[in-house]
Every structure is written in structure tokens, then in C-alpha cells.
């Protein structure tokens, strides 16, 4: 007997699907236009290599995100009409699917909610001219108010956020363009700090940051694919919403940070908000407020997805209660400053979902480019592949020498290939359980 999350699953009919430019492309582009993507991008990239190297990294990273992390999940969604937690039951099993990708997606969404709450709070306080520092009373008060409000909207009124999400996504794009023109004059004067010059590190860190940021969204390509009409929608939605969006949403901030440092040699820090502060005046304050407002969809959707993941995989848990409980954890991570370290969080996300995407890709290809169907019990081929890939993905956190750590990035990419290869080998060795029938 199948669990409820499979027994009650109904494929999305073709009549409810839409073209790529109405759903997939703008939704994915909105993910990359979120401030969390590029806030700390420059500090680990253009400090080690020139803009040409970093732009090459953006191009390659965007194509890798599209081809490796998005395409197979999206095609599975297109062909089945089912969301990620259903199609994942092939790679991880009917019982195994509870945890991966089901509950794991919910847990990581709490982390994303914390990130969204942290930066919205930080930018609101900076816009008000108030000292912004985690673990202080103003930061805690603003973080709790923002987090609780967004969690409630995510639990009870997500449909209203969906209606304005595309409009709000246009705000950061406009801000990126304005900041670029404000700083463009200094781009030619930017020079990589001589003591840190290492193009290899610049290129690999660009890949690591982009792929780590995208990993969960790539697996969620299943949910976008189930809303696509055909393979062309899947391809164009990914190429425009992912590959092109990475270049625009990553490239403009890199140019802006480089330009700001070229024009102001005394500028401290390579975070994107350092550039906004350097612009100064009412313009900077307005920008901080607008970036915070543009974080509304991300905060609400993270809360909604987390609650939905928990309530779907554990039906006895009410969705609103699980949403608010997850939000409470996220708020704590935000106001204490834990959520401020984006690069480390991206690495964890890449380590968690890189091998999931890799194992799913192997399963898809071994099954003749189709969904095999749910597999009985736990698919240990999937779990072992994930564990091996996760270990590879967290290598940057292990006590390795600085020289070795130079070569462990992009760990998220290596974790994908580890998951792919290990799953393929174990599947060939007969470790995949038998397929069980879905209800008609």
C-alpha cells in the first residue's frame, strides 16, 4: 500500500500548463535577482581574478546549472505531471522518499527563510539609518516582526504574493541597473589585489557559489516542468531563466563592485551593500528599502515550501503549524547572525542537493529517459549515492590544508558527479528495489 503522498498524487493536466515565458523563466530569473545571490558574490571572486575570468565562470556555471541540475528534474515533471516529492520516490524509494527529497527540502527552506529574514532586516535598518548588527535589540525586533509577518502570509495568503511576485522581481533588476550606471566609471581602474591574485580560485569559486545557490531550485525544476507544455518550454525556460539570468544577475553586481573599488580605493568590503552605502544619501536609503521589499516573495515562498513539505510528508502535522514552527527556527538563525554567512550556506545546500540531482539524473538515464515509477521501501542505491556525494560536498569544511582546499571547489559540482556515478554503479549491481504501481 502506497503512502498518502503517493496514493493521493494527481498529475497536473496539460490544460493547466503554460508557456515558458509565463512561469518557468520569470520564476527562475526572480530567484537569481534576489539579493542573497549576489550580496557576497564579489568577495570570493573578483578579489582573486579579473572580470573576464569571473564572467567566464558565470557563463559556465549557468550552463551547468541548466544542464545538470535543472534539465532532468524538469523533464521528469513534464513527462509525469508530478512534483519533486513524487518523482523522487524512484531514486530514493517509497519510504526513503519521506526524507529525501521530501523533508530535506523543507529543512533547507528553513535555512533560506533565515537568509531572507536576515537580509530584509539588515536592509530595513540600514535604510532607516540605524546601526544594523545581529544580536542587538533593534535587529531582533525587526527580524521577529518581519519573519512572523512573512511566515503568516506564507501559510495563509501565498496566492496574493504570487500575484505580485513578478512585479516585485522587477525592483532588484532596476536597482542593479541603477547601481551599475552609478559605478561604471571606475570599472577600468579596478585591479585584483596582487597578494590574492589567483584566477583558478576566482573561476572555481564562481562555479561553487552559483551552483550551491541554485541546487535546491534545480531539483525543484520538477515542479516547473509539470507546468510546462512541452520539451521546448522546458529548454527555453531554463536557458533564459537560468543561464541568461545568472549572467545578468551575477554580472551586473560584479561590475558594480569592481567599479566602486576602482573609483574609491579606500572602499572597505566587497559585499554588494558596501557599494550601495558608498553611493550614499537618500538614493541609498531608498535602495535598501526596495531590496527589502523585493525579498517578500522569497521569504514567503520559503516559509510556504517548508510548511508544505512537512505537512505533505507527515500528514498528521498541520501545514500552518509546521510553517510557523519552521519560521521560528529561521528567525532565530537570522537574528543571531548565523544566516549571514552565505557562502558556507551555499556550500551546504550544494552538498545536500548536488548528489540528489546527480542520482536522479542517473536513475533517469538508466530508465530510458523516463520516470521508472516509485520503488518499494528504501532505494539504498539513492541513499548511498547521496551520502557519498554529501561527504564530497562538505570537503571545504573539513580540516584540510589550505593548498588542498584550493582544489576542492566547486564541491557542489563534484558532489553531483559523485552521486551520479555511485548511483549508476549500485543500480547496475542490482541495488534498486522493484517498481510498484501508482494508482490509476
Q: Model-predicted segments: where are they?
A:
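C-terminal membrane-solvent junction of multi-pass transporters and transport-like membrane proteins
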Residues: 358-440
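Membrane-interface "cap" regions at the ends of multi-pass membrane proteins
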Residues: 1-55, 65-66, 198-207, 226-233, ...
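Juxtamembrane transmembrane-helix boundary signature
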Residues: 58-92, 101-111, 115, 428-431, ...
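Hydrophobic, membrane-embedded alpha-helices of multi-pass small-molecule transporters
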Residues: 18-35, 180-186, 194-258, 281-300, ...
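Membrane-interface loop-to-helix entry segments
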Residues: 141-182, 197, 238-242, 346-358, ...
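Selective recognition of specific alpha-helical transmembrane segments in multi-pass small-molecule
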Residues: 29-34, 60-69, 104-114, 171-182, ...
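Transmembrane alpha-helical segments of multi-pass small-molecule transport proteins
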Residues: 27, 31, 102, 130-155, ...
Amino acid at each position: 500500500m502506497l503512502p498518502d503522498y503517493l496514493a493521493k498524487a494527481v498529475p497536473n493536466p496539460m490544460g493547466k500548463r503554460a508557456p515558458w515565458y509565463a512561469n518557468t523563466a520569470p520564476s527562475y530569473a526572480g530567484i537569481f535577482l534576489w539579493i542573497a545571490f549576489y550580496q557576497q558574490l564579489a568577495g570570493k571572486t573578483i578579489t582573486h581574478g579579473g572580470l573576464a575570468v569571473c564572467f567566464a565562470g558565470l557563463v559556465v556555471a549557468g550552463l551547468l546549472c541548466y544542464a545538470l541540475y535543472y534539465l532532468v528534474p524538469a523533464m521528469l515533471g513534464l513527462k509525469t505531471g508530478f512534483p519533486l516529492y513524487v518523482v523522487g520516490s524512484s531514486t530514493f524509494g517509497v519510504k526513503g522518499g519521506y526524507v529525501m527529497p521530501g523533508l530535506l527540502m523543507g529543512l533547507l527552506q528553513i535555512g533560506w527563510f533565515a537568509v531572507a529574514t536576515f537580509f530584509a532586516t539588515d536592509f530595513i535598518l540600514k535604510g532607516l539609518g540605524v546601526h544594523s548588527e545581529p544580536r542587538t535589540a533593534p535587529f531582533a525586533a525587526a527580524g521577529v516582526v518581519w519573519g512572523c509577518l512573512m511566515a503568516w502570509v506564507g501559510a495563509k495568503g501565498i496566492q496574493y504574493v504570487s500575484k505580485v511576485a513578478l512585479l516585485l522581481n522587477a525592483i532588484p533588476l532596476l536597482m542593479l541597473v541603477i547601481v551599475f550606471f552609478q559605478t561604471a566609471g571606475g570599472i577600468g581602474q579596478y585591479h585584483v589585489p596582487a597578494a590574492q591574485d589567483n584566477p583558478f580560485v576566482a573561476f572555481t569559486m564562481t562555479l561553487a557559489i552559483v551552483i550551491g545557490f541554485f541546487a535546491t531550485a534545480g531539483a525543484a525544476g520538477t515542479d516547473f516542468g509539470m507546468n510546462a507544455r512541452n520539451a521546448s518550454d522546458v529548454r527555453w525556460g531554463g536557458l533564459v531563466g537560468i543561464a541568461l539570468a545568472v549572467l545578468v544577475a551575477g554580472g551586473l553586481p560584479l561590475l558594480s563592485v569592481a567599479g566602486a573599488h576602482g573609483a574609491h580605493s579606500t572602499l572597505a568590503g566587497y559585499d554588494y551593500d558596501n557599494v550601495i552605502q558608498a553611493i550614499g544619501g537618500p538614493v541609498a536609503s531608498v535602495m535598501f528599502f526596495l531590496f527589502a521589499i523585493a525579498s517578500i516573495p522569497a521569504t514567503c515562498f520559503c516559509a510556504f515550501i517548508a510548511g508544505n513539505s512537512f505537512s505533505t510528508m507527515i500528514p498528521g502535522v498541520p501545514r500552518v503549524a509546521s510553517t510557523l514552527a519552521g519560521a521560528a527556527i529561521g528567525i532565530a538563525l537570522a537574528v543571531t547572525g548565523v544566516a549571514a554567512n552565505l557562502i558556507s550556506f551555499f556550500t551546504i545546500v550544494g552538498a545536500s542537493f548536488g548528489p540528489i540531482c546527480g542520482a536522479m539524473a542517473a536513475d533517469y538515464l538508466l530508465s530510458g529517459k523516463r520516470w521508472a515509477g516509485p520503488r518499494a521501501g528504501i532505494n539504498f542505491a539513492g541513499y548511498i549515492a547521496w551520502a557519498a556525494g554529501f561527504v564530497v560536498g562538505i570537503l571545504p569544511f573539513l580540516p584540510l590544508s589550505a593548498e588542498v582546499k584550493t582544489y576542492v571547489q566547486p564541491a557542489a559540482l563534484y558532489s553531483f558527479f559523485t552521486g551520479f556515478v555511485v548511483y549508476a554503479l549500485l543500480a547496475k549491481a542490482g541495488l534498486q528495489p522493484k517498481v510498484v504501481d501508482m494508482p490509476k
